Amino acid sequence: PDPEGELRYVMDAVRLIKRELHGRVPLIGFAGSPWTLATYMIEGGGGDHDFKRTKQWVYSQPADVHKLLDIVTRSVISYLQAQRAAGVDALMVFDTWGGALAAGAYREFSLNYMDRIVKALGNEVPTILF
């Protein structure tokens, strides 16, 4: 999606909040991590967060999971770049469900994609991984 198109209301809100803050406090923009967003896409918003469907897909069709994560990563980068352009002072990526993965799977299916995000964003503003 085009952040200044379909999500223009978010960027307008960022610009308005930034203006109203008058530099008193930093404004932090944010997005979910590709892994976390993918789990919501696969599992839906409810459930007990055991991620059965997602884990089944990870282990049975890892190439397809990587395709999804690549698409989501590109969207997250675009969204965060737009927030930065709208005036945020820092960016945060929330990896809420990264802990659902074993260490090796975490590196492959979550950390790898957050690394791509950090590299794409550069160092114009701080980027926080949480």
Where are these regions (language model features)?
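Active-site loop segments of alpha/beta catalytic cores
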Residues: 6-130
